[in-house]
Amino acid sequence: MLNHFNFKLKRDVTIIVPGEAFVSNDRVISTILGSCVSVVLYDGVRRLIGVNHYVLVKSDSVVDVLQKGRYGVYAIPMLIDAMIENGASKSNLKAKLFGGANFMAKGTIRVGVENSEFAVNSLTKYGIPVVAQDFDQSKSRKIFVFPENFKVVVEYPDGAKIF
């Protein structure tokens, strides 16, 4: 995790890397995604946001406790728990999902598709509505999550969108 002043935004930003998550009520949270997925959770009543960044759905071997955030099977429930520990109510949570790019040729390993499908299915299982998603393109993206309005700005190599 890196905290820095973003001159373009004119404010402090917390950047998370693969395997990390962060919860805040006042800081912009950012990360860069390819085939990885970030789940953005927010509680509009308690004014709280949380973002994770996972690499794969699961590991085929035993996972060290410090590496659990790299795998969706752990990263998603850990983010939900962190939101609740910081004052969110599970019944207020909503999700926005990003990443899941596929850079490989069709018919090969599709990590991005697996990651994005897992996120959607997991949040459905937890009863958290997905209100926006940006998946399955063959390009990277950088996201900025804003705590004051829960908007996510997604920057691509060739443009940007707001979710």
From Swiss-Prot:
Task: State a single Gene Ontology molecular function.
Answer: protein-glutamine glutaminase activity
Q: What class of enzyme is it?
A: hydrolase
* Alphabetical keyword list: Chemotaxis, Hydrolase
GO annotation terms (biological process): chemotaxis
Cystines in this chain: none
**UniProt keyword Hydrolase present:** yes
Q: Which InterPro entries does the UniProt record give? A: CheD-like_sf (IPR038592), Chemorcpt_Glu_NH3ase_CheD (IPR005659), Cytotoxic_necrot_fac-like_cat (IPR011324)
Q: What does this protein do?
A: Probably deamidates glutamine residues to glutamate on methyl-accepting chemotaxis receptors (MCPs), playing an important role in chemotaxis.
Q: Which HAMAP family does the annotation name?
A: CheD
Its family?
Belongs to the CheD family.
Q: What protein name is recorded for this chain?
A: Probable chemoreceptor glutamine deamidase CheD
Organism, scientific name = Borrelia turicatae (strain 91E135)
Q: Which gene encodes it?
A: cheD
